[in-house]
Swiss-Prot record:
Protein name, entry field: Glypican-2
Family as reported in the entry's similarity comment: Belongs to the glypican family.
Main function: Cell surface proteoglycan that bears heparan sulfate. May fulfill a function related to the motile behaviors of developing neurons.
Known partners and oligomeric status: Interacts (via heparan sulfate) with PTN; this interaction promotes neurite outgrowth through binding of PTN with chondroitin sulfate of proteoglycans, thereby releasing PTPRS of chondroitin sulfate proteoglycans (CSPGs) and leading to binding with heparan sulfate of GPC2. Interacts (heparan sulfate chain) with MDK; this interaction is inhibited by heparin followed by chondroitin sulfate E; this interaction induces GPC2 clustering through heparan sulfate chain; this interaction induces neuronal cell adhesion and neurite outgrowth.
Ranges for region Disordered: 347-382, 483-552
GO annotation, biological process: neuron differentiation; positive regulation of neuron projection development; regulation of signal transduction; smoothened signaling pathway
Lipidation (GPI-anchor amidated serine): S556
Organism (species): Mus musculus (Mouse)
């Protein structure tokens, strides 16, 4: 037995898996031929790689034992490891960026095109039905759609003012058509605008149409704008997170993971999977967006469902012409009552001379009536897209990326360059210091849990990551508020429209299942000057001048001209019965 002892010691010395320490590979693998072959294929100069192992006292990251790497080679391998890791992360996230960018583009194009379709349909139908009379006043309708686009595309402010200005301008154009026998100077029109802006809402020339239009269009625009902004924010945050520079601690851990086996002369020895997962979790802790990511996706889906349900953008775009027509019909049907109150408050204007009165429209034009065609199918854009299809696609795409950040370390370590395959989990692997089994526990989870990661220090504050998460939280909060009909960028988004009156929302404002909303009280809007082409605006004192000496004759004045008003209604009908 004693004679066999030297032979047993020699065999123990030569066995790679049973060596006395981590440096056993150096005693077995004396040649750097395999390392030279691998690095030569990568374009490394073979002059920098010794043919056999040398002392590793100069190494800064890898174990300072026998090595095939010079200092320069080690630094190049550190850079290569970083490039490999960043490439894997960016490639893994390219689908996510493409998904958010494509959804943003499709929804944005759809909403913009729906506004254009609504404007074109209204102009086409009104122009066909009323010809010259609509053309003369088309500017106020074009201004309305310009204001809606500005809200959606640009500042996100002034939606209330846009709608209120539209109804005020429409009244300034429509009211004189009811009374062509009078001349209406700017002071009278200023008084008219003030009267429709009073807090009590006593004069509602267009009935409840302004309020209903505002409720429908504002909630749809707020939701559409928040959804598109949310998709854009998500795309930008993800793109930034995937391109974050690798920190020094991560660079060194990556070098120990995939670079040091080359320096030890064992490039075929794959890193242990647990080792790779710890390095990946630690490096990606400054990129991951959990748990904000899940809430962000929920906000997108919630808002998308609202947009094809109670806050339907399609329905809102279609209803613009309908609500305007209903408002004009109300003004026509209640013209006597509205005129009496206006003349009582603002006085009776001067009559015009007979030769300058407007001639009535031809009887055949005045007798026209326009009826909305029944809705046959969901509106589509020129590309054949409708909102239902877009929402379905969004839901399907987001289901694929919900666990992206939590699963990114596993995805990275699934690459053959980063770790051993799962089928080789029981085989010896590279532990960071030598051949063996990786015994440290794999640390997953949040930033706080990564403080216990054995491979790199994650305790330093990460301001950029916190900022990105705050961006996601802000986008999520904006989308959830929009799903409730609130615009966080415009504090008065739920207030009632000017001159439209108050009260509960009507049952036909939304599709079935929508919850009625009681609008909060709104302070009176400051009066706006009339917006008539070519007319200046003087002070409000002119209204009082019209009141002086006229109120006592009001009854006879209104009574005298009422038959004339009724006779002239066919002329006004050509503008007022718009749809």
């Amino acid at each position: 037995m004693s004679a066999l002892r030297p032979l047993l010691l020699l065999l123990l010395h030569l066995c790679p898996g049973l060596g006395p320490g981590h440096g056993s590979e150096a005693k077995v693998v004396r040649s750097c031929a395999e390392t030279r072959q691998v690095l030569g294929a990568r374009g490394y100069s073979l002059n920098l790689i010794p043919p056999s192992l040398i002392s590793g006292e100069h190494l800064q990251v890898c174990p300072q034992e026998y090595t095939c790497c010079s200092s320069e080679t080690e630094q190049k391998l550190i850079r290569d490891a970083e490039v490999t890791f960043r490439g894997l992360v960016e490639d893994s996230g390219s689908f996510l960026i493409h998904t958010l960018a494509a959804r943003h583009r499709k929804f944005n194009e759809f909403f913009r095109e729906m506004l254009s379709i609504s404007q074109h349909s209204l102009a086409q139908l009104f122009s066909h039905s009323y010809g010259r009379l609509y053309s003369q006043h088309a500017v106020i309708f074009n201004s309305l759609f310009s204001g809606l686009r500005d809200y959606y595309e640009k500042s996100g402010e002034g939606l209330d003012d846009t709608l209120a200005d539209f109804w005020a301008q429409l009244l300034e154009r429509a009211f004189p058509l009811l009374h062509p026998q009078y001349s209406f100077p700017p002071d009278f029109l200023l008084c008219l605008t003030r009267l429709t802006s009073t807090a009590d809402g006593s004069l509602q020339p267009f009935g409840d149409s302004p309020r209903r239009l505002r409720l429908q269009i504002s909630r749809a625009l707020v939701a559409a704008r928040a959804l598109v902004q949310g998709l854009e924010t998500g795309r930008n945050v993800v793109s930034e997170a995937l391109k974050v520079p690798v920190l020094e601690g991560c660079r060194q851990a990556l070098m120990r993971l995939i670079g040091c086996p080359l320096c030890r002369g064992v490039p075929s020895l794959m890193p242990c999977r647990g080792f790779c997962l710890n390095v990946a979790h630690g490096c990606l802790s400054s990129r991951g967006l959990e748990p904000e990511w899940g809430g962000y996706l929920d906000g997108l889906l919630l808002l998308a469902e609202k947009l094809q349900g109670p806050f339907s953008f399609e329905l809102a775009a279609e209803s613009i012409g309908v609500k305007i027509s209903e408002g004009l019909m109300h003004l026509q049907e209640n013209s006597v009552k509205v005129s009496a109150k206006v003349f009582q408050e603002c006085g009776t204007p001067h009559p015009v001379q007979s030769r300058s009165r407007r001639a009535p429209a031809p009887r055949e034009e005045a007798s026209r009536s326009w009826r909305a065609s029944a809705e046959e199918e969901r509106p589509t854009t020129a590309a054949g897209t409708n909102l239902h299809r877009l929402v379905w696609e969004l839901r399907e795409r987001l289901s694929r990326v919900r666990g992206f950040w939590a699963g990114l370390p596993v995805t990275v370590c699934g690459d053959s360059r980063m770790a051993a395959d799962l089928s080789q989990e029981t085989a010896p692997c590279w532990t960071g210091v030598g051949r063996g089994r990786y015994m440290s526990p794999v640390v997953v989870g949040s930033l706080n849990e990564q403080l216990h990661n054995p491979e790199l220090d994650t305790s330093s504050p990460d301001v950029p990551t916190r900022r990105r998460r705050l961006h996601l939280r802000a986008a999520t909060a904006r989308m959830k508020a929009a799903a409730l009909g609130q615009d966080l960028d415009m504090h008065d988004a739920d207030e009632d429209a000017s001159g439209s009156g108050g009260g509960q929302q009507y049952a036909d404002d939304w599709k079935a299942g929508a919850v009625p909303v009681v609008p909060p009280a709104r302070p009176p809007r400051p009066p706006r000057p009339p917006r008539r082409d070519g007319l200046g605006v003087r002070g409000g004192s002119g209204s009082a001048r019209y009141n002086q000496g006229r109120s006592r004759n009001l009854g006879s004045s209104v009574g005298l001209h009422t038959p004339l008003v009724l006779l002239l209604l066919p002329s006004a009908l050509t503008l007022l019965v718009l749809r």
